[in-house]
């Protein structure tokens, strides 16, 4: 019996990457019944590296240069239950990528001075660039789980400055954070779109905690990190997000942490502030607009500092008690 993922729109989209019928012209639907679009490009082990990347568009008959939005799915590791049917995929994913990358991340205590990726990550990056070239005017939405999360992180980090601006949003789940094995140039690229990348990790899933420090949270990580407040499942189900639960607002329930929730909120507000500043600057600032921007920036910073202080006091009190 197939279990249900929690009914979060973006998680549901991400997990369509495991659809057994995923192939060219396949109509992609989430488990909850929402239609995402049609697969128009497939990159399945094109160079023997094991990558599986899919481009999905709403109208496959539309001219490529007219397409406004493309969903890119990076498939995660082939599960142990498929070892006999997909032995080559299983070996590629687990032995030549998951294990290798995990080892490199754990040995790399500080950010690297060079790219320490694998061939699958590089093949995935080529696939994303190819998709973006085919659809030159489209905004790109990126999704990935497990190894697919790492493929997605690396692919975005490998884009050029003019290309990365087209990433509209990215939602990645239960994969190691590869920030510390990226080159300095690649880290700058993902940092430039940090608030567009939503990086979910389950503290009860050992795989998704590789390369992470719960105290640092989103600091020194790819994107905004969210630690999921999950229920306990067996090893496989925990990793496959079946421990995820929704809060009262219908969003994935996350753990509160100064360096995640408050820091993430600060970054998002500052991102909105920057967009507002750019819009107002088009005609030059009036004195009133400059005063408004200064007070807005100060207000965001003050509110975040206050929340961090309150959170810090609560943590100290809980430790003392």
Q: Where is each model-derived feature located?
A:
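Gly/Ala-rich beta-loop-alpha elbow adjacent to hydrolase catalytic centers
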Residues: 144-148, 152
């Amino acid at each position: 019996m197939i279990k249900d993922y929690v009914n979060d729109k973006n998680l549901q989209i991400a997990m369509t990457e495991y659809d057994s019928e995923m192939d060219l012209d396949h109509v992609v639907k989430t488990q909850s019944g929402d239609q995402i679009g049609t697969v128009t490009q497939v990159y399945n082990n094109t160079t023997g590296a094991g990558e599986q990347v899919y481009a999905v568009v709403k109208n496959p008959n539309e001219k490529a240069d007219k397409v406004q939005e493309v969903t890119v799915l990076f498939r995660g590791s082939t599960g142990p239950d498929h070892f006999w049917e997909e032995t080559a995929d299983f070996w590629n994913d687990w032995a030549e990528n998951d294990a290798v990358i995990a080892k490199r991340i754990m040995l790399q205590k500080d950010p690297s001075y060079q790219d320490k990726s694998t061939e699958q990550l590089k093949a995935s990056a080529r696939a994303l660039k190819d998709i973006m070239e085919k659809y030159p005017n489209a905004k790109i939405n990126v999704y990935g789980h497990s190894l697919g999360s790492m493929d997605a992180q690396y692919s975005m980090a490998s884009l050029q400055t003019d290309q990365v601006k087209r990433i509209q949003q990215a939602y990645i789940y239960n994969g190691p954070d590869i920030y510390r094995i990226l080159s300095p140039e690649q880290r700058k690229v993902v940092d430039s779109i940090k608030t567009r990348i939503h990086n979910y990790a389950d503290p009860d899933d050992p795989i998704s905690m590789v390369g992470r420090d719960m105290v640092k949270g989103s600091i020194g990580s790819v994107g905004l990190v969210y630690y999921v407040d999950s229920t306990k499942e067996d090893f496989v189900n925990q990793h496959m997000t079946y421990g995820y639960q929704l809060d009262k607002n219908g969003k994935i329930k996350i753990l509160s942490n100064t360096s995640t929730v408050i820091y993430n909120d600060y970054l998002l507000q500052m991102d909105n502030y920057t967009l507002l500043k750019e819009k107002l600057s088009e005609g030059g600032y009036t004195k009133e607009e400059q005063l408004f921007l200064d007070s807005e920036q100060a207000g965001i910073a003050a509110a975040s500092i206050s929340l961090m202080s309150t959170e810090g006091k609560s943590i100290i009190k809980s430790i003392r008690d």
